[in-house]
């Protein structure tokens, strides 16, 4: 259990275990320093497999041991919060250049014959909508589409470079944390600079503050997020070098600090770019939407509906779920519309196709609201398990939990999905995958069980935490037009005199989301090229197609 900051292992009924010198998982007790775990001699089993000695041991197991684990997780989280505020990179528009360093270890090499070409294919190139929908998109296209062309990052792949030591030197856990991962990042940067592939590293300082905006490291082999029992692997994460207590590397007058990293492999296969998009989104300012405090939780948050939860893994990470309206609004890519009076909404598009989110705000507490959006069956939504109207709940009185990456370390959570069928099954890997993914199909409105309304008295209901009179802003007659990929509904009873339909989010004039590209991704402008050849054309709806200009 855990994340990049603190991880530990426990039995299915919550007893902490640790690996002893013989390689057995035994019950653990905290040391006197309150920071390190000590092994007992009792080998751990799940409840149905325990013998008498083990059961007797657990009868006397100190009741405060689990609380100590949670306290330690909280201490580490607070320490990381004090050091790291999500969102070092403030550039959310334009075409910033971001270095991506491919890293091999002395004992583990990247598996592809030509890894640089492979990562340029997965990260850097423009992709058509058709390619996106069959899992052949790219990280570049992901951010272009989420931003409606406002943000077109230029990922520059460097390497591979080979580090001096094996992966375990950098990844072995000490008291639940990767001990030397910072050294991996510094060494990777130093070796990348030494290759002289980049003639001027200052091009990566897009805001001219003397720091490379962000550097991304992709390391060979598996990550501990996929194989948590293998404690010598590295967790994908985003952090700062200075907060690892290391001197900042420097090249061409700029220093390196903010970084992200993730693994090449995911359970035996080359991973797509979902985790890459997740970690890079941390650099841009998005938090995790799962619990980050080490506590067990059966509370449904954003789950597979958000890139910042399980949604990064859709289609083996080759078709990560698109940004939710809340996430796009934070980036400044869309501006949600608040519904305040009786309105009929017709043919509402997804935010990927130019629509926007609709906010329904608690009149008593403006920081508590619902945000609704359309999930269609195209582009990055193609892999979604449900389609129709998706409703998210938000209650953020302060942005501190967002910046400190503790958004959903509360019960109830601050940001979560409303399941239309009222089935909020949480994922337990290896136990209930089929039930979990089946339940996601019922999260959107109208649900498979026929629920087409969201009111103070519906199931689920439009509940609020602040106020006694309820939300009093019902959504009724919710429908989804599969052919159009749009949603319609009545707000507060609807109104023939107040109809909202097909609103398109504001876009930059003549951005790279519209117009013509060369096949290598260079934007040529909005006028059709005159030189014969094959080009990519993106229309005002963000859809791309190949064209041929003949002599």
Where do the model's predicted regions map?
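A residue-level detector for well-ordered beta-strand positions
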Residues: 17, 275-278, 514-515
